[in-house]
Amino acid sequence: MAKTASPGDTAAGNGTEPLPDKYETALAELESLVARMEGGALSLEDSLAAYRRGAALVAFCQQQLEKVEQQVRVLDGATLKPLSSGTAATDGDDDDL
């Protein structure tokens, strides 16, 4: 299982940490990195390392989402339709995004 940075570690380790096995783990680590960077307590070097790690985590999460999307397309076949502008997703109901 992949090691995630604890609060006492440097911002993102030495840059050679393996990516997490799961999307949820990567997202949690990414959220933690963002919070630490927004806190402003990181040195410039740690901020750069955190940014690099964050970029790798974002790429991993995007890949995982693309894989799931492909699986959904296979399962749903031609029943998938583009999201129209009048759907609930654009009504502002989800403030967590």
Swiss-Prot record:
**What molecular functions are annotated in GO for this chain?**
exodeoxyribonuclease VII activity
Could you tell me which InterPro entries the record lists for this protein? Exonuc_VII_S, Exonuc_VII_ssu_sf
Q: What does this protein do?
A: Bidirectionally degrades single-stranded DNA into large acid-insoluble oligonucleotides, which are then degraded further into small acid-soluble oligonucleotides.
Origin superkingdom: Bacteria
Q: Which SUPFAM superfamilies match?
A: XseB-like (SSF116842)
Q: What EC number is given for this enzyme?
A: 3.1.11.6
Enzyme class, first EC level, given as a word: hydrolase
Q: Which HAMAP family match?
A: Exonuc_7_S
Q: Identify the NCBIfam families for this entry.
A: PRK00977.1-5, xseB
Q: Name one GO biological process term.
A: DNA catabolic process
- Could you identify this protein by its name? Exodeoxyribonuclease 7 small subunit
